[in-house]
Regions:
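Flexible, substrate/cofactor-facing loop regions flanked by secondary structure
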Residues: 35-37, 140-222
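Conserved GNAT acetyl-CoA-binding A-motif
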Residues: 94-108, 221, 250-262
């Protein structure tokens, strides 16, 4: 049996190396971003050692798990036995925190994690699609709905934007759990990928009716972190216009493509909207859920 203990910041480099190794083994490339890992750990604060664990064998780090307030679980392990030991700790802690469920996202090619969750009583719930849109073709101009104006994010907009996101996501996902506002603001804005000029806010008569939040372009790629439209504005082309506005903005900054992730079961029609806008799926992630 591996040694399981609480995670500390001294483990950071070894955990990132493990995540990178497991990603490359499953996908042939790495989709691990150390800065994202760092920000998730920072949000845990003093609870990191209680809500996150590492597995060690002969002094080598061979597994890691992170329990988040959103009732999501991150898991990486060299084999399913190590994964099971970490999962047992995570489930026990989740029950202590009165979580209603645990959700874990993994690619089908990650054999140790998929075997762990299947054996651990998780059910495959739905898929997340990763999609990309090339920007080297003719880009249509955005057509804004009558009466809607668009501007970049300002320092005083955080609470309104956060509320719009939470309302939109909770409106169709009964399991959605938002972050505390201070945690959300820290995760979203206090890092190098944040650029307020890439956060587009759509308003009607001063009311926020849509937003599209993007990360700064990296190595020629842009990223749509969040895009939502208030239910009162859906069906008028605002989502498409926000995307097209982003295409032109990214292209003007030299990006060659833009990507996003979307829940395949999103009932607002988002996956179909993205396909019509030129996005193509290149990776699928399964969401596994266990009710506690």
């Amino acid at each position: 049996m591996p040694e399981i203990r609480g995670t500390t910041w001294d483990d950071f480099d070894a955990v990132v190396e493990l995540l990178d190794t497991r990603s490359r083994k499953a996908l042939g490339t790495s989709d691990v971003e150390p800065e994202i890992v760092r920000r998730r750990w920072q949000l845990a604060g003093d609870d990191l050692v209680r809500d996150s664990w590492v597995a060690l064998e002969d002094g080598q780090l061979v597994g890691h798990a992170l329990l988040e307030p959103t009732q999501d679980l991150g898991l990486a392990a060299r084999d399913a036995g190590i994964g099971a030991a970490l999962l047992a700790r995570a489930i026990r802690r989740a029950r202590e925190r009165a979580f209603a469920r645990l959700a874990l996202t993994a690619v089908d090619e990650d054999d140790p994690v998929c075997e762990t969750v299947r054996n651990g009583g998780f059910a495959r719930d739905r898929e997340i699609l990763r999609m990309w849109r090339a920007l080297n073709t003719a880009l249509p101009e955005p057509r804004w709905p009558d009466g809607v104006t668009v501007r970049p994010y300002g320092d005083d907009d955080g609470e309104r934007v956060h509320a719009l996101l939470d309302d939109a996501y909770a409106g169709w996902d009964p399991d959605y759990i938002g972050r505390d506002h201070d945690d959300w603001l820290s995760f979203m804005t206090r890092h190098e990928e944040f650029d307020p000029d890439l956060w587009f806010l759509a308003e009607r008569a001063g009311a926020l009716v849509g937003c599209a939040l993007h990360w700064r372009e990296t190595e020629g790629s842009g990223w749509v972190k969040d895009i939502v439209v208030h239910e009162s504005e859906r069906g008028r082309g605002l989502g498409t216009a926000l995307l097209q506005h982003a295409f032109h903005t990214y292209a003007g900054r030299g990006a060659a493509r833009v990507g996003l992730k979307v829940d395949s079961t999103n009932p607002t029609g988002a996956p179909a909207l993205y396909e019509r806008a030129g996005f193509v799926t290149d990776q699928r992630y399964a969401i596994w859920v266990k009710r506690l």
